[in-house]
Regions:
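A general structural signal for well-ordered alpha-helical segments in protein cores
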Residues: 1, 28, 119, 140, ...
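Flexible C-terminal active-site loop/helix
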Residues: 210-241
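Conserved, mostly hydrophobic/aromatic
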Residues: 4, 35, 65, 103, ...
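Glycine-rich tight-turn/loop motif centered on a GG-T
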Residues: 47-56, 171-174, 216-220
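Short helix-capping segments at alpha-helix termini
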Residues: 8-14, 38-39, 69-71, 95-99, ...
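Active-site beta->alpha loop and helix N-cap motifs at the rims of alpha/beta catalytic domains
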Residues: 1-85
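Conserved short secondary-structure transition element at the edge of the structured enzyme core
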Residues: 144-148, 184-218
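Catalytic alpha/beta core domains of metabolic enzymes, predominantly
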Residues: 67, 79-193
Length: 241
């Protein structure tokens, strides 16, 4: 909560979304209530569990969260991390709950026809007010081109102007510029694939003097030595450092 309060204190008019995922529903609800009381504009919830969850269990989790708070909730569909795969039908049932405002979906195919078909198929199950946000920064431009409403960006947390160049171009229909801006960041995307976005961004923040070198919660470990030097090299090449 200290991190959230610090973020809110410095965010100004920028909305802050708080992650509330936890292994137990009681902890999810406690985090949700604390974040709402602190003033978070939205809540991001992934169905995290040591044991594989059923669709009914995941639905019940989101139902409980929507009952406990009024703050808008974003469904975090991240099968790589959670080992749970949402069906479109389950997304539709959850989206009908009060408070559900958005779904953060996994990266889409680079094939524009396949990507657009995937977005269209999912939208067919959702109320009009529920937005779709793409994740996976390297392929985010494909999601925007396919009709996603936004991009839940790793990069945007530390380099918002860079992410905005892509989203603004996509928002005006200038996909050529959006693709070009994304392609320019290919060295950064390669770092994400190699080390993981959280480690790269933590390293970048440390290089910028925003946090300590070892700022990640254990068991996560930061980048050091040649890895840290490579991140610095890429950021300088992109004029981000």
């Amino acid at each position: 909560m200290r991190v959230l309060r610090e973020a809110l204190a410095h965010a100004g008019a920028v909305p802050v979304i708080a992650g509330i995922g936890a292994l137990r529903t009681r902890d999810v609800l406690a985090l949700a209530k604390d974040a709402e009381d602190a003033g978070a504009a939205g809540l991001l919830l992934a169905p995290v569990s040591y044991q594989p969850l059923t669709e009914h269990e995941v639905y019940t989790l989101f139902e409980s969260a929507c009952t406990a708070v009024r703050t808008p909730i974003c469904v975090y569909d991240n099968p790589r991390a959670t080992r749970f795969r949402f069906s479109d039908e389950l997304h539709g049932r959850i989206a009908a709950l009060p408070n559900i405002a958005s779904i953060k979906i996994p990266r889409l195919s680079g094939d524009p026809v396949e990507a657009a078909a995937r977005v269209g198929a999912l939208r067919a199950h959702l109320p009009p007010h529920v937005t779709l946000g793409i994740s996976g920064d390297a392929a985010a431009v494909h999601g925007l081109a396919a009709g996603c409403d936004g991009w839940y960006s790793v990069t945007g947390g530390l380099f918002p102007e860079v992410a905005q160049q892509i989203t603004r171009a996509a928002g005006t229909g200038d996909m050529a510029t959006a693709h070009a801006q994304s392609a320019r960041l290919a060295p950064l995307w390669a770092l994400y694939d190699r080390f993981g976005g959280i480690r790269v961004m933590a390293c970048a923040a440390a290089l910028m003097g925003l946090c300590a070198e070892d700022c990640l919660p254990r068991p996560l470990l930061g980048l050091h030595g040649e890895e840290r030097a490579r991140v610095a090299e890429v950021l300088r090449g992109l004029e981000l450092l």
